[in-house]
UniProtKB/Swiss-Prot annotation:
Catalysed reactions, semicolon-separated: (6R)-5,10-methylene-5,6,7,8-tetrahydrofolate + NADP(+) = (6R)-5,10-methenyltetrahydrofolate + NADPH; (6R)-5,10-methenyltetrahydrofolate + H2O = (6R)-10-formyltetrahydrofolate + H(+)
EC numbers: 1.5.1.5, 3.5.4.9
Pathway(s) per entry: One-carbon metabolism; tetrahydrofolate interconversion
Name of the protein: Bifunctional protein FolD 2
Gene name per UniProt: folD2
GO cellular component terms, semicolon-separated: cytosol
Keywords on record: Amino-acid biosynthesis, Histidine biosynthesis, Hydrolase, Methionine biosynthesis, Multifunctional enzyme, NADP, One-carbon metabolism, Oxidoreductase, Purine biosynthesis
Assembly information from the UniProt record: Homodimer.
GO biological process, any: purine nucleotide biosynthetic process
Positions contributing to NADP(+) binding: G164, R165, S166, S189
Amino acid sequence: MKKLLEGKTPANEIKENLIEEIKKLKSDGINPTLCVIEVGDDPASKIYLRVKRNLAKKVGIKEIGLHFPANTSQAELLEKIEDLNQDPSINGIMVQLPVPPQIDPRAIFETIAPEKDADGFSPLNLGRLWEGQSDVIPATVRSILTLIDYYGIEMAGKNTVIIGRSVIVGKPLAAVLVERDATVTIAHSKTKNLSELTKNADVIISDVGKAHLVTEDMVKEGAVIIDVGMNRENGKLMGDVDFDMVAPKAKAITPVPGGVGPLTVASLMKQAVILTRKQHGR
């Protein structure tokens, strides 16, 4: 391993830049405001929400938290989102996932106004990514791009394998990397001979949630490895990549924890500020 792609340093830089940017907006009478909706009482969600709220407070974003009971109907939730869409004091809206089974996440993504879409999951914003026209990008995707840019990883012409096809990471990531002239292959649970794809990859990005999915024999010498997976095994947090075995072969690799993770909430706050600026013609 020649380079460890740690995310804490670039995340701190984003936070410091946001503090200054938000101070300037507030001096012009603009107060970035993010509404975060929680449905139910998922323990993991509460931890993540606390991190979001703490960072919002630190950088100067006004965070409005709305909590709905677990038995809330989809119609009730969507009606509230529609109200927030019309509220000019709200710049960004996000719903903490997962939501209870009676609520379809796709209906949420379709209802949040694209101009207030803090998560970047609305169909219109995702479609714009394929046209290279959107600066509204899902937070995890923005985090990966930040690492690529911060560490000067060249993507043009690189054979890039993305493992995972979710609308949250895999698909939008493919769109933005194609715009950067990467040659992108998306692999998934039905992909045959995954190792044949990864052995020829200059860059491997995994977001599956399966420990030890990417092993040393699947990676060529000098590849760049970005691990987005989050798994817990024997009380230890780890990614999709067998880090100890793969790292010696890699040109650069993210640790888990400490790689993409530290950037995700900072990226979400950055998106809230981008939305605020766009709404005020900045």
